[in-house]
Amino acid sequence: MDPTRPPFRGSPFHTPLGVRPPVLETKEEGPHGRAVLLPRGRALLGASAPSSDTTQRDPSDSRNVLPALFRGMGIETKPSGIPGRGGPVFGRGFLSTMSSGDGPDQPLSEPSIRPSLSTRVQQASDFSTERVALGRARFPIPPVSMEKPHVPTGRGLLFPSVLPTLTSDPVPKESPIATLQIEKEEKWEPLPKKGSKGSPCQLGLNLIKINFQNEAVYQYHVTFTPIVECRSMRFGMMKDHRSVTGPVTAFDGSILYLPVKLAQTVELESERRTDGQKIKITIQMTKILDPSSDLCLPFYNVVMRRVFKILDLKLVGRNFYDPASSTVLQQYRLQVWPGYAANIRKTDGGLFLLVDITHKIIRSDSVLDIMNILYQQSPENFQDEVTKQLVGSIVITRYNNRTYRIDDIEWNMSPKDSFSMSDGSKISFIDYYSKNYGITVKELDQPLLLHRPSERKAPKGKALDIVLLLPELAFMTGIPEKMRKDFRAMKDLTQQIHLSPKQHHISLGKLLKRIESSADAKNELQRWGLFLDTDIHMTTGRILPIEKINLRNNSFPAGEDLNWNREVTREACRSSVHLLYWAMIYPKRASAQAQELSSMLERIGGPIGIRVNHPNCVELRDDRVETYARSIKSLLEGEGKVQLLVCLISGTRDDLYGAIKKLCCVQNPVPSQVINTRTISQPQKLRSIAQKILLQINCKLGGELWGVDIPLKSVMVIGMDVYHDPSRGMRSVLGFVASINSCLTAWYSRVVFQLPNQEIMDSLKLCLVAALQKFFEVNHSLPEKIVVYRDGVSDGQLNTVENYEIPQLQTCFQTFDNYNPRMVVIVVQKRVSTNLYSTATGQFLTPQPGTVIDHTVTNRKWIDFFLMSHHVRQGCGIPTHYICVMNTANLGPDHLQRLTFKLCHMYWNWPGTIRVPAPCKYAHKLAFLSGQFLHHEPSIKLCDKLFFL
């Protein structure tokens, strides 16, 4: 740092109006919910609960009760009512205490500055009508009005009520527990999802079977008379009666879970310490649960979090890491922390602990080190460069292992500035870190990093605070941009991250041994009657039959590695379009490369059945965006017919690429090919690269490269995906691609722009009706069956797809007279934690492409399967999860699995299989191009071509 010019100091600092006091920090040990009750008059967004600890809960309260708790209570009350204060607590969060029975401790937070104007509105709760905060939550509270509710669109779809209807009468002093009846869960019947095609294979899964010692878990409803509104006071009263309930409890304020059976009704008495009032506590058994019940999963996951903490694993975000076992890449100044992403799931095979191996990349340089480097490189534009480099980055503070996003830099503040503690006393940042963490701050003139927490992380009853961090104590995470372009560096890093199946199994085995060798960890599990298997779960899967690839004059099996690059570059394509009238634009310094590429395309076109004429060459004086744009407009407006426009550009330039694509896809529609001169700069590789370019050009002109046998007749296959660009705040883009011929080799595409961050699509009718009309033009009939592959949907949105998107699709059929096709809708999930290991040879290897498993690990509520369709060269085999949410075509499991596998062969940008069906990949490419570069719907003239490849 330049001693004569402190680069970090700005204008004098003025003490902020509000300060959030630092308090001791603990992690909330329960799932976080979103569906909550709000009193009348309170805004649905940004409203704050009363500051007192009452039964009415704030949307930001992470300790809200799961709606599933009351769903299983069997409470029968009057219809259409409202709870008063102190009534049963509703919500989605769960269990702030476990076996300890203590209330939540105060968290130790970062020094933070509260905004001067509160973004929340506090209003006292009353007994009037409650409204519902709708969002991603799957179980919104039912409306209280008897009128038909308005159904909003988007993620917050209002589903039928799953909670007991509540009374609008004043709440009685005593809860009507006499109406509670003990009931047992209904038995579950497995869905018909197992296929039979293919050869069996032995598989290992990254699942550990959970076994039970207890026969049941007992659910109780706890009533306090008179009503005790303070939640922590209720925790304290229940803690006083551990001699009755036992040391192991899960209590959320009104619902109590125990591994032991009490009498049907237990009455206890406590004294309220604030006024000496005698409080009657009535514990009423409401349900006998199987130990593997869904209602038990939240506190089982809390138990596992405690086990990981006992093993001295550090919680960072949602995963646990082991910094003590980190690998240091000294030459790149990086640390790689190994860790585990674990959660308990109930599947068709029972209750399992799913453990995925994960890694956290931590840079050895602090944010302050990066600031010093930037200052040395550009002292004049120092602050601008720092803002450009750091804002939006994720940092970790090692003293508490928490991650933060940098939203801004406070140049006018330093560690010497002070803030107010909860008791009103002032303390500087220097003293705060020294007192609480024993850290001595060395750089006193450094600015502070600013982080704005999201609304859902706001403490109960408090406005959103601004977190301030010291650059000296914050470390960058992730891979540096410069390193991403270094092939050797990325190779060294991926060797540490992409573990082989054998290494995966060893890591999982080490975790199980650590749990087994820790008496405290085993005791934590046994308190709830849980114990784990000593190894991962083994089962049997299937390898689907190898598909046959069809070219124009030849057919051949795909082979074990599922790659047919040699065949498609030596034999004629299934259907080709001759390249007769095309143009090539390039800067003057790339003229030699342009001539070589043109000559090579003419030579290699013959074997693959494409005749290539000499192009109309346009040489540019420079490579500015304006020069390209002017030449392209002049060429396309002056020429009578141009089949294709090829542009050579130097380097990776998003601005130039976007300008070319806008001109060719929106303003003057023509298929275009943009080629980086670096790609064709090596003569020894030019032939193979030119072959790939020509095959891609053939697709863009409407040609077909290869196909597979499709036994289904009169079928349309649709792929849908959504692209989001949150960094730019642009609208979301829906990519829609549908097949329009019988062999699924011709495609029709459309794009729909949506509101920001809107995943559920609102404009399907426009796309599907246009696709059906195009299908009719080609085939002179409408499809009898429609198969939809919907990408980018999480488990929590499955019901929304079923209840909202599918009805939109079905309304399209009313456009045509007497048309009611059979329909299949399959959700495609790529981001899964399930790993497959082949154990056929006695060793843990990557499964063969075509490996499918449709049992054990599958979802109990849906017909689904996991398919490993692609060839993996490095790391573990991560399958793709397919969930069938609708099937009126009566396609069996074998039909669904084999059709999906066939479509994974049909992506023409790669002569092999890919992770998802081709229409999904096409939809993704289309949505990405439109959202990232075009920012507009492509011209309708290009809809029947794969112009977006």
From Swiss-Prot:
Q: Which GO terms describe its molecular function?
A: metal ion binding; piRNA binding; RNA endonuclease activity
PTM comment: the record says: Methylated on arginine residues; required for the interaction with Tudor domain-containing protein and subsequent localization to the meiotic nuage, also named P granule.
Q: Which InterPro entries match?
A: ArgoL1 (IPR014811), PAZ_dom (IPR003100), PAZ_dom_sf (IPR036085), Piwi (IPR003165), RNaseH-like_sf (IPR012337), RNaseH_sf (IPR036397)
State its Enzyme Commission number(s): 3.1.26.-
Query: Which residues are the active-site ones?
Result: D721, E759, D791, H924
- What keywords is this UniProt entry annotated with? Biological rhythms, Cytoplasm, Developmental protein, Differentiation, Endonuclease, Hydrolase, Meiosis, Metal-binding, Methylation, Nuclease, Nucleus, RNA-binding, RNA-mediated gene silencing, Translation regulation
Q: Which CDD domains match?
A: PAZ_piwi_like (cd02845), Piwi_piwi-like_Euk (cd04658)
**Annotated spans, Disordered:** 1-125
Any idea where the Piwi domain is? 644-935
Can you cite a GO biological process for this protein?
meiotic cell cycle
The protein's required cofactors: Mg(2+)
What residues does the PAZ domain cover? 366-478
Q: In which tissues is it expressed?
A: Expressed in oocytes, testis and liver (at protein level).
User: Is Nucleus included in the keywords of this UniProt record?
Assistant: yes
| Comp. bias intervals (Polar residues) | 115-125
Cellular component terms (Gene Ontology): cytoplasm; nucleus; P granule; PET complex; pi-body
Q: Which SUPFAM superfamilies match?
A: PAZ domain, Ribonuclease H-like
Entry's localization field: Cytoplasm; Nucleus
The record describes the protein's role as:
Endoribonuclease that plays a central role during spermatogenesis by repressing transposable elements and preventing their mobilization, which is essential for the germline integrity. Plays an essential role in meiotic differentiation of spermatocytes, germ cell differentiation and in self-renewal of spermatogonial stem cells. Acts via the piRNA metabolic process, which mediates the repression of transposable elements during meiosis by forming complexes composed of piRNAs and Piwi proteins and govern the methylation and subsequent repression of transposons.
Subunit notes for this chain? Component of the PET complex.
Listed PANTHER family: EUKARYOTIC TRANSLATION INITIATION FACTOR 2C
Query: Which family would the database say this protein is a member of?
Result: Belongs to the argonaute family. Piwi subfamily.
Quote the protein name from its UniProt record: Piwi-like protein 2
Give the organism, scientific name.
Answer: Xenopus tropicalis (Western clawed frog)
